[in-house]
Amino acid sequence: MRTEYCGQLRLSHVGQQVTLCGWVNRRRDLGSLIFIDMRDREGIVQVFFDPDRADALKLASELRNEFCIQVTGTVRARDAKNVNADMATGEIEVLASSLTIINRADSLPLDANHVNTEEARLKYRYLDLRRPEMAQRLKTRAKITSLVRRFMDDHGFLDIETPMLTKATPEGARDYLVPSRVHKGKFYALPQSPQLFKQLLMMSGFDRYYQIVKCFRDEDLRADRQPEFTQIDVETSFMTAPQVREVMEALVRHLWLEVKGVDLGDFPVMTFAEAERRYGSDKPDLRNPMELVDVADLLKSVEFAVFAGPANDPKGRVAALRVPGGAQLSRKQIDDYGNFVKIYGAKGLAYIKVNERAKGLDGINSPVAKFLTADIVEAILERTGAQDGDMIFFGADNKKVVADALGALRLKLGKDLSLTDEDKWAPLWVIDFPMFEDDGEGGLTAMHHPFTAPRDMTASELKTAPEEAVANAYDMVINGYEVGGGSVRIHNGEMQQTVFGILGINEQEQREKFGFLLDALKYGTPPHAGLAFGLDRLTMLLTGTDNIRDVIAFPKTTAAACLMTEAPSFANQAALTELGIQVVKKAENN
């Protein structure tokens, strides 16, 4: 039906007869001439109808936005004065000789000339996807997956599929369950990741595996989360953690070079402890120049319990955050930031405004100045590198609250004061995470997952001091987003059972849930390690949007619903009966 795409026509096509298929993007009727912008997935081209082709001109008068049409015509060069530098096809136009209206369009529920609500865009997603910016994002996504496949093939990885209907395992979020008709009362789980299957593939001898795979997690959603998402899943045997990172870093550098024309260079490597200490986050945005600076040793003897208490507590921390040019902040802005950090558990926000550093106490403005000596103030200013016109904010509490509160404040100030370089790419690896974290109920939970190996510890050493264990894990972070994470896996049965025991999984439960894994570990398991990238998040970064729904063709809302198909929906009673399922309605409170 077509010979060319609208958006691919150039001066090299001048004089050629072409047939185009697409949609009317815009129509301008000048009486004796009618111009339309015709659009397909590759872009837009100007088509015009003149009186010499009367039938086509007459039919063109009926055209409206989003009519689906076919046009045959001749490509012509535009006069110099009519060249449109804003269009890729702006040097040419098509003189139409024939027009076919394939399908007409009703009045549109989306307005191309105004900003539509996200609710409307999701309800009429098939129309929203016609917009050039949306089409470009999905084309970029397709390019990314193509580049990934070629790279992985070139590096000896095998694309192997793993099951969608599997067994529920504890991986940190709720599973989506699928009832079995054949085995009434039993359920499959949709995979949160192919974690155990890819480890079993390593045990099967497939030493380099990858898969671009759908995963499912029934969790509370955020702007960068979806209940179903796509992973670039990777596993290797006989490779160390640095070797895995080297290959995966090469993949991401390849993507940025091919898609953005940007060489990311070598990725710096930072420990979890350093990232938390300097940036208050395990996924630091290095485009932001501000850092947290420890000042507890300077404040242990001050007559101000808010500072002195945490400064003398081994579990406490007092940190300072220097804000370049922050002295300009108004009292209301400071109060707003004080309320902001309370979201993260902080009780408030002490500060020092540096007006003229050379004047000592007389050169600062601070509600806590009366508790500080000139020497202490000078030491704080020296350590933070404060200059005239800067602001210093303080966090004083337990270590987690200080990191969370000042880390979040750092990001907010970076954005509010334009301190974060939005034109920069800042990738890094974060390594050496704690193996476990407090579950809030007196027990421990795995910081990554229960199959991550500890660094340099035997099973008996791990059992004795699990709180001290460091995971042989690594996350790739770009511009403050965790785009991928992985680890060296446990390949020893004793170690795996030790980890399960620390997590409170008794031997009977281990056999019920992981018996197949424990059995497989008995038969010559190779050392193995892997990583998974979030394809949706990578695409989000590479297309410059901050909403993950913009890079998924048919995404869910933050309530995990599809507004277009109205999923989820109630099931047919006959189907439920066949599955042996009875829906119990909650009693309404009177």
From Swiss-Prot:
It is an enzyme of class 6 (ligase). One of its GO terms (molecular function) is ATP binding. NCBIfam families: aspS_bact, PRK00476.1. Catalyzes the attachment of L-aspartate to tRNA(Asp) in a two-step reaction: L-aspartate is first activated by ATP to form Asp-AMP and then transferred to the acceptor end of tRNA(Asp). The keyword Ligase applies. InterPro entries: Aa-tRNA-synt_II (IPR004364), aa-tRNA-synth_II (IPR006195), aa-tRNA-synth_II/BPL/LPL (IPR045864), Asp-tRNA-ligase_1 (IPR004524), Asp-tRNA-ligase_1_N (IPR047089), Asp/Asn-tRNA-synth_IIb (IPR002312), AspRS_core (IPR047090), GAD-like_sf (IPR004115). Belongs to the class-II aminoacyl-tRNA synthetase family. Type 1 subfamily. It comes from Salmonella paratyphi B (strain ATCC BAA-1250 / SPB7). GO terms for cellular component: cytoplasm. L-aspartate binds at residues 171, 217, 448, 489. Homodimer. This is Aspartate--tRNA ligase. ATP binds at residues 217-219, 226, 482, 534-537.
